[in-house]
Amino acid sequence: MNLHSHSISSLQGALTVPGDKSISHRAAILGGLAEGVTEVDNFLCSEDCLNTLRAMEQLGAKVDVLEERQGYGPVRFRITGVAMSPKAPERPIDCGNSGTGMRLLAGMLAACPFDSEMFGDASLSSRPMGRIMQPLEQMGARIEARGAKPGCAPLSIHGGRVHPISYTLPMASAQVKSAILLAGMFADGTTTVRQPAVTRDHTERLFRHFGVPCTVDGLTVGTCGPALPVAHDLTVPADISSAAFWMVAAASRPGSRLTLRQVGLNKTRNAVISALQRMGARMDIVPTSPEDAGEPYGDITVYGSDSLHGTSLLPEEIPNLIDEIPILAVAGALGRGDFIVRNARELRVKETDRIATTAANLRLMGVDVEEFDDGMVVHGGTPLKGTELSSYGDHRIAMSFLVAGLSAQGETVVTDAECINTSYPGFERDLAQFL
């Protein structure tokens, strides 16, 4: 599927983007492990999250759909958990394109008294899994990576009784941290994870939401097992990573006034807001979540202008806006001066090499980009030219450059854009209302 965009005058009105991908994965897993029935609302019915939900069904959780998004899947459902006693799956678990799903499920499966297998698509099968294998094997699991590339999926997991560990992450990774904590729920004793930098804390927040012990002491996070999550209804906020596309679209078109509703405002995810504000974007943020919400959320109104300019992303920001770097690079191209990203080597092992794919597409639009092993410098200020671009099968690349097309001269075509359903089902519809 190819999608098209073209230059527009401004963006007006209000928009509600789909539920948060990171939180939806964790809601499916913890709701599926819990004792009792959890109602989940505003679940992200994308391919990635639906694969995780199906995996929990394979492991014994029961899902009753209450509301579906036509053509996509459940956005509201009740999940009856297995009370920390998953059953052995009858077939290998398909994680599709989702590194989050595979890594988090591996943490849980490592502690289960049966063998299991997980696989994914070609992109997922090239992404590094050794980073979770090492700590989980220290906890007592046996994991075989059977992919064509060393340390890559498919994974064969020989689970069983795990023991607690104290582990220091070699890189800032919320996925690895979460895999260890999920395994730690099954262990007898305290498991701790020390991070080199703060990473998104959705797992810690949802542990508390479901009554699982969780401690945070500076950069060290811990849990004490064995723990039994207790069912607790949850509303998933709108995904700030998906909202970021529209923040940039509105901020870069003078005269725009666009309100994004019920966007997650977790402080470990809002670095994209800080970065855009440093670049000259003007926003009003109104918190709207109740006191007992598992995750904070609110409405963000973005005002367009012609005064965007470059910035340097701070090293401590990188783990918390890693998914937004492609769209921030587009913002940098649309502004004046240099947009600088360093210390972001992790981009090389996302769904695509996002340093290379972002730089390649920007160059095709006429932008001067310097590429480094761990980042890039985007020299902004040159008018963008519409052209045909590849998504490279990467949802965030596809959406970033369709947004770029809203400020480009001529038509922009992004090929193989069906990958957007990985994280944002309905993006095509939302885009169409502004064209």
UniProtKB/Swiss-Prot annotation:
Gene3D superfamilies in the record:
Enolpyruvate transferase domain
Single GO biological process annotation from the record? aromatic amino acid family biosynthetic process
The EC category is transferase
Metabolic or biological pathway: Metabolic intermediate biosynthesis; chorismate biosynthesis; chorismate from D-erythrose 4-phosphate and phosphoenolpyruvate: step 6/7
Residues reported in the UniProt entry to bind 3-phosphoshikimate: K21, S22, R26, S173, Q175, D323, K350
CC per GO annotation:
cytoplasm
| Active site, renumbered | D323 (proton acceptor)
Q: Where in the cell is it found?
A: Cytoplasm
Q: What is its main location?
A: cytoplasm
The keyword GTP-binding is assigned to this record: no
List S-S links within the chain: none
Q: Which residues bind phosphoenolpyruvate?
A: K21, G99, R127, Q175, R354, R396
- EC no. given is 2.5.1.19
An example of a GO molecular function for this protein is:
3-phosphoshikimate 1-carboxyvinyltransferase activity
Keywords of the record: Amino-acid biosynthesis, Aromatic amino acid biosynthesis, Cytoplasm, Transferase
Q: Fetch the InterPro entries from UniProt.
A: Enolpyruvate_Tfrase_dom (IPR001986), Enolpyruvate_Tfrase_sf (IPR036968), EPSP_synthase (IPR006264), EPSP_synthase_CS (IPR023193), RNA3'P_cycl/enolpyr_Trfase_a/b (IPR013792)
What Pfam families does the database record attribute to this sequence? EPSP_synthase
**Entry function:** Catalyzes the transfer of the enolpyruvyl moiety of phosphoenolpyruvate (PEP) to the 5-hydroxyl of shikimate-3-phosphate (S3P) to produce enolpyruvyl shikimate-3-phosphate and inorganic phosphate.
How is this protein organized at the quaternary level?
Monomer.
- Family to which this protein belongs: Belongs to the EPSP synthase family.
How is this protein named in the record?
A: 3-phosphoshikimate 1-carboxyvinyltransferase
Q: Which organism is it from?
A: Akkermansia muciniphila (strain ATCC BAA-835 / DSM 22959 / JCM 33894 / BCRC 81048 / CCUG 64013 / CIP 107961 / Muc)
